[in-house]
Amino acid sequence: MAYNILLMGASYGSLLASKLLFGGHSIHLVCLPPEAELINAEGFRVRLPVRGRAEPVVLDSRKLPGKVTAGGAAGVNPADYDLVGLCMQEPQYRSAGARELLDAVAKSRVPCMSIMNMPPLPYVKRIPGLDYEALRPAYADATVWDSFDPK
């Protein structure tokens, strides 16, 4: 069964998308307009260095079984997806567009995974005995996580 997957972020997201495309899933990358235009026109390529090989292995999204599209955050409805991936660096979630989409993701209750450079604050809140409030200043803007239910 193929799934519709929303990935916020094209840089980290392309790496994860390349793996998911092997499974025949449909991926939508949320990114900046110039990135979206390029991905929609030419797909993306991920180069993976492999020990013992002179050249990296190149994964071309156009040659994989799944389908990838890209676009900005405006107008994206998380409820249209089976899974959301958080694939941007933590400070980027406070930017206009990303902040609103992240809030919509939280309120949609669609399953959400993260490959961020630090764990989302609601994920940290699940750790028993940890002073969650003491960690809020470590985030660029901890309020972007307030709509998420850590359960």
Each model region followed by its residue ranges:
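NAD(P)+-binding Rossmann beta1-loop-alpha1 motif at the extreme N-terminus of oxidoreductases
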Residues: 1-52
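Short linear motifs at secondary-structure transitions and domain/linker junctions
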Residues: 2-5, 20-22, 59-62, 87-90
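Generic local-structure boundary detector
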Residues: 16-19, 23, 38-41, 50, ...
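Rossmann-like NAD(P)(H) cofactor-binding subdomain of soluble oxidoreductases
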Residues: 64-151
